Structures are given as C-alpha cells and as structure tokens.
Amino acid sequence: MLYRDNGRKLVLALKHGDRHDVVRPAALWLARAAQPLLTRNMLIAPIPLHWLRMLKRRFNQSALLAKALAIEVKQEQCPDLLIRTVRTRSLDGLRRDERFETLDGAISVHPKRRHKLVGRDVLLLDDVMTSGATLSAATQACLSAGAKNVCILTLARVAKDT
C-alpha cells in the first residue's frame, strides 16, 4: 500500500498510537503479498530499533508484524536476528543519500543469532520503505553474515509524486 492518506494513518496508528489490533489484519495482507517471495525454511526477521528508541516506543512495530506474518505463513521468525549497533538520528527530512550515509554500518546480525541465517533465505520485514536505506543496510548485514538470499517486505512504501 502507498504511505499516504489511509495507508499512512494505518501505519502511524500502529507505530505511534498503540493500535496493535491492526497487526493481524496487516499480517494477512502481508502474507498474500509475500507468497511469491517465500521459500522452504525461510527465516523471517524484523528491521530492528536501537535499544534507546525501543525503550521510548515500548515495542517494535516491525517485530509485531514479523511475528504475526510468521505464524500466518508457518515460517520461523527471529525477532532479534538483527541489531542496531549505532544510535542514528531520525531519518525524517533527510535526502536519500543522507539516509544511506546515516545507516552505513548501523545494522548488524546479532552474534548469537548468526547461525540461524547461514545458508538460508531471509525475509526482512519493515513497516514503511522510504528510500530503501534501512532495508539496504539490513540486507547487506544478512548477506555479509552468510544468508543465501534476502527478500524484503513492507506494509507500505513512500512514492514520490510525479
């Protein structure tokens, strides 16, 4: 879905409005969208929040979606496969190149979870894709740690007006 109008309201309700009731319906929609991407024994993982942001927000909306999706598609999920090793500033208002620069090296595979992804296909899940910088950093971390393939799935995406 596009991240505008009702799509934006839905994502923000989950992200900042504690509307966890939207997780299951969103997971059903994500499961349909994920079907062409899914492989046997795929590992599903959310995009991580830095621990300080997690304390402030109290939950990771992408982790809630990843868990619900994994149940729906009967695949293993690992909520802490990835970690934010750097506390980055908010990406709001940054240009595309600034977003990629800010996230360079900011995400890595949890050292105690690396064994879960070696030689496996991984599906990374996030709530919104804006520039792709976060998903790119997470994908690179997974591939560098030995993932076979990495696919990405988001609930919404930002599209530029043309």
Language-model segments: what does each one mean?
Residues M1-I71, D92:
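Extended interfacial segments that mediate partner engagement and assembly in macromolecular machines
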Residues I71, E76-T162:
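PRPP/pyrophosphate-binding module of the type I phosphoribosyltransferase fold
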